[in-house]
Amino acid sequence: MRKSFFGLCLALAVSASGAEIKIAFSDFTASQSPTNFHNALAGTGQPGDWKIVTDESPSAFTPLMPGTAPAARAVRRPVLAQLSQDPADEHFPMFIYDGQVFKDFKLTVPFKIVSGAAEQMAGVVFRFQNASNFYVLRASALGRKVRFYKVVNGIRSDPIGPALDIATNTWHTLAVQCLGNQITCWLDDKPLTATMNDSSFSAGKIGFWTKSDAVSYFGDTTIAFTPIIPPAQALVDSIMKKYPRILGLRIYLPDADGRLRVSASKNKSEIGMAGTDAESNSLTNGAVYYGHGKGTVDVDMPLTDRNGNPIAAVRVQLKSYMLGETRDMVLTRVRIIINEMQKQVLSKTDLME
């Protein structure tokens, strides 16, 4: 399905095994600066000038007939361009996608190196933390090579990759796949190196990269990924698998502004809902609350750390089995569930992303 996400045109598909996002620069008009991105810079100078321009895009090439070579059609489509031309050597403009954090994924990016006197480069950053910590895969037309490296606390590692001719003013494709600590890179569907292993960054954002005065274009970008399940939600999912008869299960945690909200739930549409005084008192004072409805009972209890200090509030909804069921009987049933949750939680960090 196609939707607008904070003004960014993208296509999102979800399957049982994962999801896919297409960042569709071709849906913009010339001179726009795509939203849901932010400018970043490693090194010196000013941030890059990232805008939409029109160009003969890679998707404008189609075969004349099956079995024949692709033929160029005079079709121009919007693409992302980095247009600043700062010749400083240590000048690395980046354009970071803020829509999501990715852990395990495959990123596929069409690119074209257009010009540059000092450098002619284009690349991608991934598992980006900030302008001092990220991975890079980049192609250099002047240097005739493709290189992978990492930046940790502003220090670049030794680059890895082969010597290759990279034609300018020609569309190519970079791809990178991350599975755990395994990283695999391609240029134009050909592997660049053996799969590499690095554990510096386990997840992060993706973005586009250039160097110095390089003017480079980027086409519609695809990210196939496994959605990240927050630890609190993973805990709820595991408890629901063990106790499938639970009618409702929520974990409440303070948000960035200190407001108590549903952080994880059996019903994911409840995530983000505000907590009540009952949950607030469970978290603050360790209080236990009990209530019943038609055929159901609801209990709020604290989830504690290894020292017994409340770190979250939990609401459990169960079916009321008999008319004579007492409050103590219900609390005993709920404590079995809470105790199972406690086995997986030693501190608040066990619930946080």
Model-based region annotation:
Residues 163, 186-211:
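Short, solvent-exposed beta-strand-to-loop segments that form ligand-recognition rims
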Residues 152-173:
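Short, aromatic/His-centered strand-loop micro-motif at the edge of beta-sheets
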Residues 229-233, 319-353:
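Juxtadomain coupling helices with adjacent low-complexity linkers
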Residues 294-303:
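A short beta-strand signature within small-molecule sensing/ligand-binding domains used
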Residues 25, 107-109, 169-185:
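Short tryptophan-centered beta-strand motifs in secreted/extracellular beta-sheet-rich domains
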Residues 237-258, 336, 347-351:
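Short N-terminal helix-loop-first-beta-strand/juxtamembrane motif that initiates sensory/input modules
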Residues 32-79, 90-91:
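Extracellular glycan-recognition surfaces and repeat-rich motifs
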Residues 74-153, 211:
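Secretory/extracellular carbohydrate-interaction modules
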